[in-house]
Amino acid sequence: MEKKLERKYGLFTAICMVVGTVIGSGVFFKAQNVLQATEGNMVLGIAAWVITGLLLIICSTMFSVMATKYEKVNGVVDYAEATCGTTYGYYLAWFMTNIYYPAMTGVLAWVTARYLGVMFGWSLVSAEVMTLASLFLIGTYALNAFSPKLAGKLQVSATVIKLIPIILMAIVGTIAGSSNGTLPANFAGAMDALSGGKAMSNLFGAVVATVFAYEGWVVATSINAELKNPKRNLPIALVVGALVVVAAYVLYFVGCAGGATVTELQDPNLGAPNAFQNVFGKTGGLILNVCIVISCLGTLNGLMVASTRGMYSIAARNQGPTPKVFAQIDETTNMSTNSSIWGLLVCCLWMVYFYGANLSSGWFGLFNFDSSELPIVTIYAMYIPMFIMWMVKEKDMGFGKRFVLPVIAIIACLFMVFAAVYAHGITPYQNAQADGKFSFPVAFYLVIYAVIMAAGAFFYKKNKNNIEA
């Protein structure tokens, strides 16, 4: 008789798991990006965090309903297969393996190195920081390959530690900023600048910037099989957990504004560490910076785990290039070594791209785009067919769950896609046109996306033909 997972988690544990999964290192460096996008407007910045949080709540609620229907499903690729079929599931898995996870992993390696480098006064684009980023990539790969238990302990420790700077900055920064006048000064004049197309353009850019900090919520639906009364508790856990995350991010953002001027927070070399040092002093700021580094390492470790398993998950379905090679499991480490090496190489390529496109003068010309944002928005676009097929297939669901909720989720995803096109297409196009140049990053990102997905199509069809032969 097949042994089933025990339903051992209650509602409170589920909420904690959602919060622990979603809250990550993105808030530490994206807070600066948000202010840069809004040109220092705190009101627009807060609006961006709230809007993206609302989109998170809508989509996570939709997935929670799907999770109660497909109780044996574990992971977004399985949801894709359940709703749209195995072919769509394969393409989503290919995208996540070769674009989504490695792009985020490459960025996180740099973010981790950047915050460690700040303590030594290194520039965020210095050779020292990039060398550290490379070492972090290789180090997390080695940790997962040779000591997965230790990697798991790092994950647990980082989950607790990453909450420390967020909570302290949210409380102490807000109090300090209110008493010394920094916080009111940062909000002064913000409401006056909210009218006009420029404000809307800035808001779209800020919304897309925040999406990195919220990513990871769909992983929380994987606890469905181990949750007591999942039909009741999972939707509540996702919504309440999401509200806690939104509140934490907004309060942290406000706390940072209480610890430093908007100009200081926009400083590309320091940003949030300015606020930490102003509020907690040099030593206190240094300690909190160490907490951020550990938090980033935990997130990087989690992303590396996903990156190294990607080709294995495809090969396990007898798909992709040479499934027998990527499906092999090392008897000593119980890891798919070939899949892990592929994941590491792709992560390194994306990190090099991120440096060349976003941190240097722009190595790739028209093909420069922000790899920390556009791949994440892409997955929202790829949710849309899943929601549509849910409405087509699930005839036994009530009207609200079959039509109303997925339609709202589709609108939320379309808004995110529109915001990305505006922020990474229309706005840079208008700015470049004013200088007599041309720029439309999102279009050239889609070219790269199409090429990588076409490679996936080649291997899918080739493998399918081999099976049929």
Regions flagged by a language model, labelled:
Residues 4-7, 46, 123-128, 156-289, ...:
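Helix-loop-helix junctions that connect adjacent transmembrane segments
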Residues 27-32, 143-149, 283-284, 346-370, ...:
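Transmembrane helix-loop junctions in multi-pass membrane proteins
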Residues 369-392, 399-469:
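A generic transmembrane alpha-helix motif of multi-pass inner-membrane proteins
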Residues 76-81, 85, 118-122, 239-301, ...:
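TM-loop-TM module centered on a large, flexible mid-protein loop between adjacent transmembrane helices
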